[in-house]
Amino acid sequence: PWRTYVNYNDPRLIKNYYPKMKEWFSYVDKYTVDGLLKRWPDTQYRDWFLGDWLAPIGVDAGAQSSVDLVNNCFISECLGTMEKIALMLGEKEEAEKFAMRRKNLNELIHQKFYHPGKGIYSTGSQLDMCYPMLVGAVPDSLYDDVKRKMMTDTEKQHKGHIAVGLVGVPILTEWAIRNREVDFLYQMLKKRDYPGYLYMIDNGATATWEYWSGERSRVHNCYNGIGTWFYQAIGGLRIDESIPGYQHVFIDPQIPKGLTWAKMAKDTPYGVIAVDWELTDNIM
């Protein structure tokens, strides 16, 4: 509902379902222990308490600590969205409650999952490192160290490859956009061997696969979260959430080394927004 509102300036879903959104948090509370969401008991839904999904071989996305971390970061992200929704609806007191709840949860995430001796969250995977940064669970004093550790380990442990699955792709992408780490992501996207998008293309892919390796479905709509990077980072187009529907936007291209031009266009409720930039003697 929030993304529909931001992209189309249509508040109907939010107004109709805000009570249900709040009700959903009662469900979350039912399975929260000491402030953190835990895997629910043996029910038919138990197996859907997932962390990352279909990560590359060698990434322990199924480790329980990683699964718990990812799910609690997701709750933090939802609380942030609920705060914005409440403010949009004029519910200031409820917005303050969501903000405080998120603050408390972020502190618990850091206390529970951060390993000071290793400088990592949970297993230290790309997702376990970038998701706490994205939702604000990493203290400011540690942020640069955590970022540096993730980027260094990406090179050392994964040979510079993307190392997330279906869940992690849009999270890593959004983190890279917000942090302006355009070279970090661009270098991963250029890798031609497994795992990566060029590996899919070089092996005959005409759509994204279910697995990075290509087993099972080869038309599965997985890993598509990377698409936003091309128009939000390379194209530089970011929406102004305070003025929804693309009525006001920010255009600030992030240019990785080796790229000299880009063109993009996006349909919006108020017309087509086009960006066309070219570097000449390092001047755009």
Language-model segments: which ranges?
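Non-catalytic C-terminal accessory modules of carbohydrate-active enzymes
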Residues: 100, 183-284
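Structured segments of extracytoplasmic/periplasmic soluble domains
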Residues: 24-27, 31, 81, 85-88, ...
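Amphipathic, non-transmembrane alpha-helical secondary structure
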Residues: 2, 15, 22, 26, ...
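Extracellular polysaccharide-recognition and catalytic grooves
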Residues: 115-216, 220
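Acidic-aromatic pocket-rim loops
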Residues: 57, 61, 157, 219, ...
